[in-house]
Amino acid sequence: MKRQETRLWKRGAAGLLAALMLLGAGCSQSGGNAGSAAPETTPAQEVQETEGQTTTFVDDLGRELELELPVTRACVANRYNNELIRAVGAGDCVVGVDIYTSQDSVYWPQFGEEETFGKDEYDYEKIVALDPQVLIVPRNGQVEESIEKLEPFGIQVVVITGWDNADVPKQIRLCGELFGKEEQAEELVSFYQEPVDYITQQLQQVEERKTVYWEYGDDYSTCIPGTSNDGWHNMILMAGGENIFGDASLAGKDIDPEQILLADPDLIVKIYAGEVVGNSGVFTAPPQEEFAAKAEEMLQREGWKDLTAVKEGNFYLNTAFMSGGLGKMIGAAYMAKWLYPDLMTELDPDALFTQWMAYQGFEPNAQHYYHVPAQNAAA
C-alpha cells in the first residue's frame, strides 16, 4: 500500500472540499447551488468561443452524437448520474431531475416540484419547458421513448449509467467530457480506483472467499446476475465475497427463504432506507433505533438466530445511499472490511464515505449502517 494512497484515504473532508472548490467550475455565473462542491470559475468568454461548434460525443451505449460542448443545461434522470455530475463540478448545469433525486430536499435543495420531470415515466412537456440541451438517462431508462419525444425539439438524449459498476471510470469520464470537466473527472477516477486496487491486491491472499447473503429493501429480494440488481452482485464480488444467490440461472429477484438457511452465509447485509421512494435512500439515514427495530424483525424469521453470521455478529443493515455511492465502491469497501478485517487494515470505509460526501459538498450527518450484535446461545 503506497503511503500517498493512504494519505488520500485518511484525508479530511474539509481539505478535500477546499481542493474541489479550486478545481471545480459551475455552469452559471451566479456562484452555484447549495450542496455543489464546485463554484463558478469559468470565464464567460471561454464558453462563447465554443458556441456553435459541435463535437462527436460517444455515450454509454456507443451512440455517436453531435453536441455543442461543454453542455451547460441538462435534465438528468437517476440519482447516481446526478452525483457523478456534481462530483466533477458540473452540478450547476443540471436544470431538471427525476423524483429519485428531488425527493431528498436536504441533499438536493435546488430541485423542487418545478424542476422534477417524473419518476419512471417522464413528463416530456416539462422537460421541454426546462429548456435543456440534453436529457441524460441511464441505459435502463426511457432511452428510445425519450429520443422520439425530445429530438423534434432539438433536445439530444445522452446515455450515462451512473449506477453501473462494471466500468465506473468510463461513466465518470463521460460526465467530464460532456460538461468540460475532464481534469476533475480524472481526479475522481483516481479517488475511485485506489481503494478498488487495494482491495483487489489484498484479496490475492484469500484462498476461499467468504459467502454473503445480500438483501434489498423488500424482504427476501436479492441480487442475481443478469437482473436489474446486477450491480449489487458485482459489489459483492468486488469486496471478495461469494454471493449465495450468484447463479445467473435463477429467475427474478425473490428467493426461497429456506435457501438462506441451507447456505448459512458468513455475512448478511440488508439494505434499509426507511420510508423513501424506491430503495436508493436519502442523505439523512434512519436513526439507529429504526435500524435496530428492522434487525429485530428479521431475527424473528424462522431459523435466523441459528445462522453463523447472526451468531457471530456478522450481520449489518445499511442504506443504499451509502453503499451505492460512487459506483458502489463505498459499499464494496465496507463489505470488504466486514468480510476480511485482518486483511483490509489500510482500508477506512468511513473515511471514504466522508470524502465522497465532500465531493458532493456535504459532511455525513448520521451513520448509514447498523451492526447487529452477535446473537449468542443466550439469545
Q: What kind of feature is each model-predicted range?
A:
Residues 7-31:
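Sec-dependent N-terminal signal peptides of Gram-positive bacterial secreted proteins and lipoproteins
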Residues 60-62, 114-125, 248-257:
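Short helix-initiation/N-cap motifs at beta->coil->alpha
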Residues 73-77, 95-98, 118, 134-138, ...:
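Structural recognition of the beta-strand scaffold that forms the well-ordered cores
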Residues 76-129, 134-140:
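A short, structured surface patch at a secondary-structure boundary
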